[in-house]
A protein has these predicted regions:
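Bilobed "Venus flytrap"/periplasmic-binding protein-like clamshell domains
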Residues: 2-22, 82-143, 150, 252-256
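Beta->alpha turn/N-cap motifs
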Residues: 11-12, 37-39, 48-61, 146-153
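Secondary-structure end/capping motifs
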Residues: 190-260
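Hydrophobic/proline-rich hinge and linker segments of small-molecule sensing/allosteric domains
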Residues: 69-90, 170-188
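A structural signal for short loop-to-beta-strand junctions that line the ligand-binding cleft
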Residues: 4, 66-74, 97
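A short beta-strand-loop structural module common to alpha/beta enzyme folds
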Residues: 26-40
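Hydrophobic residues within well-ordered alpha-helices
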Residues: 44-46, 137-138, 261
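Pocket-lining segment of extracytoplasmic ligand-binding domains
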Residues: 128-219
């Protein structure tokens, strides 16, 4: 069976899915792989263009009629949330726009969760692709923005300022891990096929865990940042037991998030 798979180029995704993409032994599937940033993947799934994808957890209520949330292959964890950064200093500026990495991203929802909980005034929001958010902060074109992925590890060396760890704020206020991303599969594939897809993802992850090195040429080639230490830190932070099985705590975090999305 040939299926369309969508994942990002971030090291945690390419680490988990590399063996699957390159072809597992005796696999019933062949994959047409689409690499894109998470907001683009969210939009592709909302248009029904992918059979299987890694998307923002926030987007799921908008696609749940057509897609099943898989029990593995996502990104949930502790101490791994998006960061609200400033290019000019340590104080949040309500009068200045905040640049977010896509309207459907979990990062956008976590910012709004923090903004509402802390009683901030009405805020102007702008959207850009995640790497553009970071570039605009580095160039001081933007005063403040929310960064994700590899840029979580590079802001200090680039002279930016931390205003709020949005993941830590989520953990403190909900008591649950941070539900960043999930894997989804088209419901029309059928339950048995979806179970097979989950098995394939777990096999791929287990193969990755047995490698001597975290960063392979496949991961290095696709990463948006040319620093193997950052790639390794990224994988260690975002790939964990929740990647293999969402479990009760993971489901609790997703349920809390989806309740917020649905209002």
């Amino acid at each position: 069976m040939r299926l369309k798979l969508g994942i990002s180029t971030c090291p945690n995704d390419t680490y988990i899915y590399e063996a699957l993409v390159q072809g597992l032994e005796n696999s019933p599937f062949e994959w047409d792989v689409h690499f894109a940033d998470v907001q683009t993947l969210n939009e592709m799934v909302r248009r029904g263009e992918l059979d299987v994808a890694k998307v923002s957890a926030q987007v799921y209520p908008k696609i749940e009629a057509e897609y099943a949330c898989l029990s593995c292959g996502g990104a949930i964890g502790y101490g791994c949330g998006p960061l609200l950064l400033s290019s000019v200093g340590n104080a949040f500026c309500p009068e200045k726009p905040v640049v977010l990495p896509g309207a459907d991203t979990t990062a956008a929802l976590l910012f709004k969760f923090w903004h509402k909980k802390t009683g901030q005034t009405e805020q102007k929001i702008e959207y850009a692709l995640f790497d553009q958010v970071y570039r605009s902060l580095r160039s001081k074109e933007a005063v403040q923005g929310v960064v994700i992925h590899e840029h979580r590890f590079t802001w200090k060396r680039d002279g930016l300022y931390l205003l709020q760890d949005l993941g830590a704020f989520w953990e403190e206020n909900t008591g649950t891990p941070i539900p960043l991303g999930i894997a989804v599969a088209r419901k029309s594939l059928g339950v048995n096929t979806i179970f097979q897809i989950e098995d394939e993802i777990r096999k791929s992850l287990n193969i990755a865990r047995k490698r001597e090195k975290l960063v392979t040429p496949f991961i290095d080639k696709l990463a948006q940042i040319d620093d193997p230490n950052v790639m390794e830190a990224h994988i260690r932070m975002f790939v964990n037991d929740f990647s293999e099985e969402v479990g009760e705590r993971g489901r609790a975090s997703l349920g809390y998030l989806w309740t917020l999305v649905k209002g």
